[in-house]
């Protein structure tokens, strides 16, 4: 086993979602709304680690990691489709214990040091033009489409990381390893930033681009529409997306749920011992 020795290792693998939380709701079928659960921690993972064994059995390890997360559906209904993914950099400090020369376990603390949760929103709504223009004919509809992205940034989180692995020597100072890793961490939401906004409206077959400010005006009109069974869902929709239309929006104190980043992953890697 490594004894009073330093080492570095690189690894790559895939993390599967764990400790799923509700990311949003699927109301595609208005009579049966379901929760959309998941974890932004699902996706491809890479790590660079450095460690030192100060005893035949015990060592300490510092690791830097990157997550390229898979798309997760976050909200869905008849006019809205939202999905999100994580792009995150993390750091961890762990104790490593050699059970045998080949088998080891590690456990420690982990935090995120950079990255974002990216949410993509597509809106496609057919609305009575009269909602926005009282003089419009009762039958005229406006077809409104919008596409935009938001980058969500969080506060510094702290979580637990642990793993069990098996290493086998392939040369004097080189070993391959395979390991299972458990990560439990949630990122408190801090702020979101709008990017890549585009929108159009189509009235009587004529399509024109509309600005962010015009689109915000449409949403404000929906929010202020008289309450009725016909407008309830639209009012809720406008209220839901209005924070996402701000260039920068602070979520602090708004009761926003933490973003889940937990995973159970499998990694393959190589270690070089000095």
Segments from the language model and where they lie:
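Feature marks short, surface-exposed loop/turn motifs that line or immediately flank catalytic pockets
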Residues: 14-20, 68-70, 113-115, 184-186
């Amino acid at each position: 086993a490594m004894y009073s020795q330093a080492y570095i290792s690189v690894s790559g693998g895939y993390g599967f979602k764990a400790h799923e939380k509700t990311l949003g709701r699927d109301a595609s079928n208005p009579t049966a709304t379901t929760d959309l659960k998941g974890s932004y921690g699902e996706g491809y993972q890479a790590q660079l680690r450095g460690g030192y064994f100060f005893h035949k059995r015990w060592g300490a390890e510092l690791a830097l990691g990157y997550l390229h997360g898979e798309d997760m559906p976050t909200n869905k209904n008849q006019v809205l489709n939202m999905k999100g993914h994580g792009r995150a950099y993390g750091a961890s400090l762990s104790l490593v214990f050699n059970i045998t020369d080949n088998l080891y376990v590690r456990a420690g603390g982990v935090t995120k040091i950079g990255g974002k949760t990216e949410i993509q929103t597509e809106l496609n709504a057919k609305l009575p033009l009269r909602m926005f223009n009282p003089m419009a004919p009762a039958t005229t509809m406006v077809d409104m489409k919008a596409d935009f992205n938001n980058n969500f940034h969080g506060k510094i989180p702290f979580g637990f990381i642990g793993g069990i692995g098996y290493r086998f020597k392939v040369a004097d100072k080189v070993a391959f390893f395979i390991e299972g890793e458990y990560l439990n961490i949630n990122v408190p939401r801090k702020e979101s930033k709008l990017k890549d906004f585009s929108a159009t409206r189509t009235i009587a077959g004529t399509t024109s681009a509309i600005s962010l400010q015009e689109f915000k005006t449409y949403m404000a009109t929906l929010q202020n529409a008289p309450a009725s069974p016909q407008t309830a869902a639209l009012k809720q929709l406008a209220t839901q997306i209005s924070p996402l239309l701000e260039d920068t929006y602070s979520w602090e104190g708004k009761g926003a749920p933490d973003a889940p980043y937990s995973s159970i992953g499998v990694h393959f890697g190589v270690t070089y011992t000095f």
